[in-house]
Amino acid sequence: MFKIALVDDSVILRSAIRNVLESSGFEVVFEAGGSAELFSKINGSGVGLVLLDIFFPTENGLDILAKLKKHLPAVKVLMVTGLRQDTIVAEAQRLGADGILFKPFDTDELLSSIHRLLPKQGK
């Protein structure tokens, strides 16, 4: 099963995303409110995808992305942001983001963004 981590400072948003993902058959391994919690939980968790917010009250999601890709380059990262700014999108891509999802998004957008990042499996 594909394992997902949710990293956002909004507990409400994390809970809503978790409900959608789990009802769609995904396993949410853990949630984190920031980088310290993310890095304390991710090693050995088997996470294949991190949904990562870009804006936090005390840190920058792009910095978290850079650190995550440096330490765990195989983990896919889907950035989540409410700001549609070309420079931010370009920087996220440069740092290794595997996709960007813009808030507000609906269930179909969330699931299709994740499905694009799933490992391809032969049937």
Residue ranges with predicted function:
Residues 62-74:
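Short amphipathic alpha-helix used as the core "switch/output" element in two-component signaling
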Residues 11-30:
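Two-component/phosphorelay signaling modules centered on CheY-like receiver
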Residues 57:
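The feature encodes the CheY-like receiver
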Residues 34, 60-63:
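Acidic catalytic/metal-coordinating carboxylates
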Residues 87, 105-115:
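C-terminal output helix
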Residues 31-49:
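Acidic, metal-coordinating helix/loop segments flanking the phosphotransfer/catalytic sites
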Residues 63, 84-99:
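Alpha4 helix (beta4-alpha4-beta5 surface) of REC/receiver domains from two-component response regulators
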